[in-house]
A protein has these predicted regions:
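Flavin (FAD/FMN)-binding glycine-rich loop and adjacent Rossmann-like elements that form
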Residues: 1-232, 243-278
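Short edge beta-strand/loop segments characteristic of extracellular beta-sandwich folds
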Residues: 235-241
Length: 279
């Protein structure tokens, strides 16, 4: 974080702003630059080695680690090693189909017995750090490590002995505190939520947008809806309004894994005739 780097980056920021403001190519007459950070924030420096090193393949395969305690969802976003003046592409992105797991073994040192890790120093490869480094993901890591540290203090454990002796119990503690552990079931027999049943007297057939000038969404291109299915969907309604006689094609896809949001496999396809009289 040398003064040169701060001055150089500041010169670039204000140079770009000068161009936006004064080139005449942008509608910026009434715009002002509100704030610029005064400290250089490094996205990557030194990382520790833990019992496991999270790799690019783990992110892309969405590996379901038994010791998962956190998750991420950012793309693998790697910036040019040569810096901002390089003529190479600005970024290299690989986007997983959905969120991925981060194991507990990446969050403590393999050779310093009482050292937890969270944030941008965790045990991941250079490429995997391109996705785990973002703030929302770092927050899940902080919760996992903070809970683990408190658990160790309460039960007189070290990070590695927690993993070896009490990990499942720790996972349940983290889960009960709304820890982001995908696919882990609540095992607490005293949790009343597990004994509850849900009933409904009515169904909602129309959403109030609270917008007086709301209009129908034109289906002049494909539109997708994503909704959870656990364990199955008995049916769904679509409200349509046609201006001409036509055919509406509906396709149903799975996403492959519960946490994904990209169509993976076609389940069924069918068409419905629609006329102006229908609604």
């Amino acid at each position: 974080r040398s003064p040169f780097r701060s001055d150089e980056l500041g010169a670039v920021v204000y140079g770009i702003w000068d161009y936006i403001k004064n080139s005449g190519k942008y509608a910026a007459d009434n715009l002002t630059l509100e704030w610029v950070g005064s400290t250089v924030g490094k996205r990557e420096s030194r990382r520790f080695m833990g019992p496991y090193v999270l790799k690019e393949k783990d992110v892309e395969d969405q590996t379901e680690f038994p010791d998962r305690v956190a998750f991420g969802g950012w793309s693998i976003d790697i910036h040019p090693a040569a810096g901002m003046y390089t003529q190479a592409a600005g970024t290299e992105d690989a986007v997983p189909d959905g969120v991925y797991n981060i194991p507990y073994r990446c969050l403590y040192s393999r050779n310093i017995k009482n050292l937890f890790l969270a944030g941008r120093d965790i045990s991941v490869s250079h490429v995997a750090l391109g996705t785990t480094r973002v703030m929302a993901t770092c927050a899940t890591l902080g919760q996992a490590v903070g809970t683990a540290a408190a658990y160790c203090a309460q039960h007189d454990l070290l990070p590695n002995t927690l993993y070896e002796q009490a990990f499942k119990d720790y996972q349940q503690v983290l889960l009960k505190q709304d820890g982001p552990i995908m696919g882990l079931r609540n095992q607490d027999p005293l949790d009343r939520a597990k004994l509850a049943t849900i009933t409904a007297s009515h169904t909602l057939s129309e959403l109030n947008t609270n917008t007086p000038d709301a209009t129908n969404y034109p289906l002049d291109q494909d539109v997708a809806f994503l909704f959870p299915v656990d364990p199955k969907v008995h049916g769904f309604d679509l409200r349509l309004k046609a201006t001409a006689k036509s055919q509406l094609t509906i396709e149903a896809y799975t996403t492959g894994k519960p946490q994904n949001y990209i169509p993976a496999a076609l389940i069924e396809s069918f068409s419905l005739p629609v006329t102006p009289a229908d609604q």
